[in-house]
Design a protein with these regions (language model features):
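Intrinsic low-complexity/IDR segments
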Residues: 1-35, 39, 45, 49-50, ...
């Protein structure tokens, strides 16, 4: 997709977000957005299902509640992107940069499509907390959870997951 066409879609989407005349939601389903410049873009509620966003610049983008199901985000730069409540089911995040990204309440893929992603401490602890919050029936796994629990409780999600304040 040409950057000029993309910019027009983003303009209409912004109008739609603001409930202004002439606005319409961004439908970028199956779009070829490889290496697209989406830095700082407002893509809240956008349909990006199965979009090819490989190596796209999504730094500081607002992707809250965006549907990125099955999207190719390999090597995408998502630094400081807001992905709260985003649907990332089946998305390929291999090699993506998620430093300082907000993935709270998102559907994050825990499969090989997330291999090689770059996480900051906050996201790592959040994922660890979720791993420690699940019930397992294997004794070795339970012991591993117990060992990792002090670190997991440093997550900002600890109070919600474990019913207690964060450890420092």
């Amino acid at each position: 997709m040409k950057q000029s066409d993309l910019n027009e879609i983003l303009k209409k989407h912004k109008r739609w977000i603001k409930n202004e005349e002439g606005g319409e939601p961004a439908n970028l389903q199956d779009a070829d957005l490889r290496r697209a410049d989406l830095q700082g873009a407002d893509l809240r509620y956008a349909d990006l299902r199965y979009a090819n966003l490989q190596s796209a610049d999504l730094q500081d983008a607002d992707l809250q509640v965006a549907n990125l199901r099955g999207a190719n985000l390999r090597y995408a730069d998502l630094q400081r992107a807001d992905l709260q409540v985003a649907n990332l089911q089946g998305a390929n995040l291999q090699g993506a940069n998620l430093l300082d990204a907000n993935l709270d309440y998102s559907c994050f893929p825990l499969w090989c499509g997330s291999k090689g992603i770059k996480l900051d401490r906050r996201l790592f602890l959040q994922l660890l907390a979720h791993i420690c919050a699940v019930e397992v029936d294997d004794e070795e796994c339970k012991k591993t959870q117990e060992y990792l629990m002090p670190l997991a409780k440093q997550s900002h999600a600890a109070k919600w997951l474990f019913g207690e304040e964060r450890g420092e």
